[in-house]
Amino acid sequence: MSLTPQIKEKPLESLDADQLRRRVLTLQYKYTTLQNEYEISKLSSERETYSLQNKYDKSMNELENALKDTKILYEENIKLKEELKSKDALPKEDEKIITTLRTQVVSLKNEVNLKEQRIVELAHKLSSKQNEVTNAIESMKLEIEGSGNILHQHETQINKHVEEIRYLQQELKEKENLISELRSVQTSASHRNNSTEELQDLAVLNKTLKEQLNYAKELEDMNLKQATELKKLRQNNDVQSLLKKENELLQSKLDQLNSLQKKFESLEMENISLQEKITQWGIVRLDGKFKNPNDVITELNMLQRENTFLLDTNSKLQIDFNQMSMLNDEMAIERNQLLDLNKDYETSILNLKRLNHELEQQKLLSFEECKLLRQQLEEFEEQDDKKKTPGDQVNASNIIEGYKNQTEDLTNELKRLNEELSKTDDKIQKRRKITNDLGISYSQRLNELILENKKLERLLSATKNHANILEQKILDLTSLKEKKVRILQLRDNPLLKEHYIRKEKLALLEKENSDLLSGIETDAIPRSVYDRIKHDMKLLEKEIFSANKKTTRLKEVFNKKSLEFIEAVNSLLGFKLEFLAHGKVKLVSCYQPNKYIIADLQSNTLKSDLDKVIPEWETLFQLYVIEKGELPAFLSQVKLRLWELSQP
């Protein structure tokens, strides 16, 4: 220790190799002594924490026992409450039981007071022990903070010394190199030149080096001892942190004990109030039919059953009422739909009447044309009889017969059209009668339901608002000028289309008729026949084109809707559906796209390769499909298992 001031006074450059080594050893010794001091302080703190831990464990055991006692008292108090509730209506014969219960209550009260006193004592003890523990912990904290500051200072000093040691080691290496060079020079020189003084110096140096080595070994032993003490101090620090946590838990348990004490006081007050009620309420209030407490219990059970039954009936009536209201709403919707259908039928009847009127006009025109044609034919026959030969007469008679056949065909077709129109009129009238009858029956049923319905006011208010809106619209329409009113009609109206086609066909037939009349003298077929056939072909092509267009559109819509349906099923149910041939359906899970389930709806069989993925496949199949016959539940279980397997 006497070497340290000399080392501090001299600079590092002026020191020899021996002095540098001595300085390094002294610094190492200081470092080890500091470490040993820290380990010793840590050991002392560990001992203190161990003693505090023992005290803490004892206090915790006492507190747990107190808590158990309070819980037992609380449960006994609850039992007493229940007994008091059940014995509020006891008969006169049970006064002895009440007296015994009162004595038990008094004894329990005394026990509770004793327990309360014990709890108060334990609380005082715990608070005193807690104060001791907190004081000890605070002192330990202060000691730890002081030791931490000292450690920090020592670490800074040690870092400085380590840097100095490194610098000194470098200088030592240089000095050793110089010494080795000098020794080599000395050995190379002659032994005669060696002086006795140099030999003495070398011997002294050898002795000092041996002493320094022994001193270094002693310092290393001291360092090891201090390291063990440091480990013990660190263990004590960990124990101290555990003690802090346990102290926090103890504080929370103390808070719980305070809350339990408050609960206990409230329960005691309730117990006193219940005793007062027992004294005030008498057995006089009970009916004579209650001879035993069991009678009261049975009566209470009966009343509870009646109450539950009445609640069930009330809920059923409420459900029936809700169903009736829903049925009423549905019937109102059906009535509105029937009214809309009635309006549609009336409009269709008006359209059919218009068509009928037009067809009758066309029929009259065709009859008149037939009459004119017959007159012309008769005149023509008279002229031909006068002019032509018997062969020509035969040809003319054949042509006339053909025309007659055509006219008869036209008349038959007109009759058929009239019959169809009459049939459609009869059907419409029948449907109208049926709808009227249905409307009458529905209206009667609605009237009966509306009388029992509470939503009449809402419907009335809605209808009043609707009526006001309609009246306002009527006023707006009447205020408009006649010039501004325009009747709109569809340009491509089907009625007009049919009328146009019939008109065009009639014109072609008239032209064909006139051409045939003019071409009687010749054997050639007139062009108008070709035009009519061409027109019929165009009409057929248009019909075929529209039918093909409709079918393609229906196919597109069907494909689109089927894809939407499959996507919706896949997103909502987790299975992608693929419809196979022969009534088979392939189910592919979204969690395992490579696996599948094929369900044969005709033979009621399942085929899948999921049994290798799901280990519980056989048990699930046996439980849900074979035993319970619930395929949807089986599929949902499979989906859940696949989802669990897909989770990381």
Curated annotation (Swiss-Prot):
Signal sequence coordinates: none
Organism: Kluyveromyces lactis (strain ATCC 8585 / CBS 2359 / DSM 70799 / NBRC 1267 / NRRL Y-1140 / WM37) (Yeast)
Protein name: Spindle assembly checkpoint component MAD1
Sections of the chain in a coiled coil: 19-283, 322-483
Disulfide bonds: none
Keywords: Cell cycle, Cell division, Coiled coil, Mitosis, Nucleus
GO terms of biological process kind: attachment of mitotic spindle microtubules to kinetochore; cell division; mitotic spindle assembly checkpoint signaling
Annotated function: Central component of the spindle assembly checkpoint.
Subcellular locations according to the entry: Nucleus
